[in-house]
Amino acid sequence: MATINQLVNSPRKRSVVKSKVPALKACPQRRGVCTRVYTTTPKKPNSALRKVARVRLTSGFEVTSYIGGEGHNLQEHSVVLIRGGRVKDLPGVRYHIVRGALDTSGVNNRKHGRSKYGTKRPKS
């Protein structure tokens, strides 16, 4: 236990928490331009072709971000909005592309969980 004099001379250090999404620069989302759209394979127990895009952000970073949902309309030079949120089985993918914002279309024929995929309410 530190004495009062020791604490007066040098106060207790605050632990600094490292950001999990540094490219967002403490913003909820960031805009960027796709530089490459491609598929990649996940880590070991899983098997798939995951759709990802390399995005150059307005903050100056170039990050890899995941394109969720079935099917997408992204290509090089598409303007996208990205949010934080990693993909556990894709190393280095720490961001998600927001569906239904800017140049990204929503998922077609989506009935449940529509708000997460930028889909409008279907005409009943």
From Swiss-Prot:
InterPro entries recorded: NA-bd_OB-fold (IPR012340), Ribosomal_uS12 (IPR006032), Ribosomal_uS12_bac (IPR005679)
Top-level taxon in the UniProt lineage: Bacteria
Keywords of this entry: Methylation, Ribonucleoprotein, Ribosomal protein, RNA-binding, rRNA-binding, tRNA-binding
Gene Ontology cellular-component annotations: small ribosomal subunit
Location of region: Disordered: 102-124
PROSITE patterns reported in the protein's UniProt record: RIBOSOMAL_S12
GO molecular function, a single term: tRNA binding
Composition skew (Basic residues), residue ranges: 109-124
Cited Pfam families: Ribosom_S12_S23
Function summary: With S4 and S5 plays an important role in translational accuracy.
Subunit structure, as described in the record: Part of the 30S ribosomal subunit. Contacts proteins S8 and S17. May interact with IF1 in the 30S initiation complex.
Protein name, per record: Small ribosomal subunit protein uS12
Source organism of this protein record: Francisella philomiragia subsp. philomiragia (strain ATCC 25017 / CCUG 19701 / FSC 153 / O#319-036)
Gene: rpsL
